[in-house]
């Protein structure tokens, strides 16, 4: 295959490079901005990505795409969530979602979960100690965050398997397979998203006037200066919370443990210096981020980036994982350093669309990795590289088979 910069996106999304896309990102940074064979533009350098993430001329609204996918817009299914909208809609919906989740109205909600997260993590890890071999994804990294987010929202534990099936189908809709017609996969994703929204909307309806101590109850019963979410807004917002609340964290935990097992000196340092774990998680977000790139932003005007004019309306892809390994911003960027300081990575994005669930993901990952390295010691990788999920956007191992000593 050609190594022309015009084929970079095709090569980045090719599954053959899923285990190690970083050499392709280094190639992208040589060009800073690379026009692709289909007309889209890729940006891979730190300063340029940071500027574009804060540029109001760059739209996140799916309705501004030059060729919007009809399967992703009404009347086929639910409208886009607030991450797929621009201000002022984005700002209003985000504030309403944040009200029961974090500061200033619910400042202690995430930290109050620390005990429950620790209990769940320790129970899962203790179950692994009894096995000679196990899959970190299925046996730990998935059940931890999905249990936490479902408890936070108020989803009954009996419904968690169905929720995961829906979420997995929605995430599969983000996959890029060169040469494949994405239509059927995207339609299945929209159907799953709609089904999940209807389920959550019905569940929330039962809490209206009969609240319990969960986010669904708060979303339908608490008022504020911005009013309340409409039924449709409630559905799309809670779907986003559920999917974003566990899919990316599964990858962060799994990528984190894989990285530590590949770097045993870092693992031993964290065992000896547990106070470094928050900094180590920030380094994981830089080094092996669960979100590799933002599939499309849309310039609302011609924009000059690194001497290249990106025309109004063309698809713009910001490769966050490339920016987080830019040697002009991070010394020795391809080295995992759990003690790294000055680590302003793009692991949770930046600008108005930065991940509002970041505090929960950070806390879950800190507790998860601390629990694993203290209770399991140093399990052995059975496959390296492991089998990866197909998605180049939400990149992480599909399975991570490990063996205990003697297993």
Give residue spans per PLM region.
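Cytochrome P450
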Residues: 1-407
């Amino acid at each position: 295959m050609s190594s022309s910069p015009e084929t970079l996106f095709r090569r980045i999304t090719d599954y053959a490079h899923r285990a190690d896309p970083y050499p392709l990102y280094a190639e992208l940074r040589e060009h800073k901005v690379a026009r692709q064979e289909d007309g889209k533009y890729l940006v891979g350098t730190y300063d340029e990505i940071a500027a574009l993430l804060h540029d109001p001329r760059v739209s996140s609204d799916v309705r501004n795409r030059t060729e919007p996918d009809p399967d992703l817009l009404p009347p086929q299914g639910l409208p886009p969530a607030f991450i797929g909208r621009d201000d002022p809609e984005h700002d209003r919906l985000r504030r309403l979602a944040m009200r029961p989740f974090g500061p200033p109205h619910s400042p202690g909600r995430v930290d109050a979960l620390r005990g429950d997260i620790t209990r769940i993590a320790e129970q899962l890890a203790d179950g692994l100690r009894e096995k000679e071999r196990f899959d970190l994804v299925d046996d730990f990294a998935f059940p931890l965050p999905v249990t936490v987010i479902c408890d936070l929202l108020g989803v009954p534990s009996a419904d968690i398997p169905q929720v995961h099936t829906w979420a997995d189908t929605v995430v599969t809709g983000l996959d890029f397979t060169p040469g494949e017609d994405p239509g059927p996969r995207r339609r299945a994703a929209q159907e799953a998203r709609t089904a999940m929204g209807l389920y959550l909307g019905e569940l929330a309806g039962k809490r209206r006037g009969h609240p319990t101590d969960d986010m669904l109850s708060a979303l339908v019963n608490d008022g504020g200066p911005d009013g309340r979410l409409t039924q449709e807004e409630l559905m799309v917002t809670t779907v986003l919370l559920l999917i974003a609340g566990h899919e990316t964290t599964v990858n962060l935990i799994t990528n984190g443990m894989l990285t530590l097992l590949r770097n045993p000196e870092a693992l031993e340092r964290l065992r000896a210096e547990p106070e470094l774990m928050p900094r180590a998680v920030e380094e994981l977000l830089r080094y092996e981020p669960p979100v590799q790139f933002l599939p499309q932003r849309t310039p609302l005007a011609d924009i000059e980036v690194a001497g290249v004019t990106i025309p109004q309306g063309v698809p713009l892809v910001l490769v966050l994982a490339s920016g987080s390994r830019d040697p002009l911003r991070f010394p020795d960027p391809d080295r995992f350093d759990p003690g790294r300081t000055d680590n302003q990575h793009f692991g949770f994005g930046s600008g108005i669309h930065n991940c509002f669930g970041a505090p929960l993901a950070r806390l879950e990952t800190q507790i998860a990795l601390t629990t694993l390295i203290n209770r399991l010691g140093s399990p052995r990788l059975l496959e390296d590289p492991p089998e990866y999920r197909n998605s180049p956007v939400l990149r992480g191992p599909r399975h991570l088979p490990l063996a205990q000593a003697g297993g």
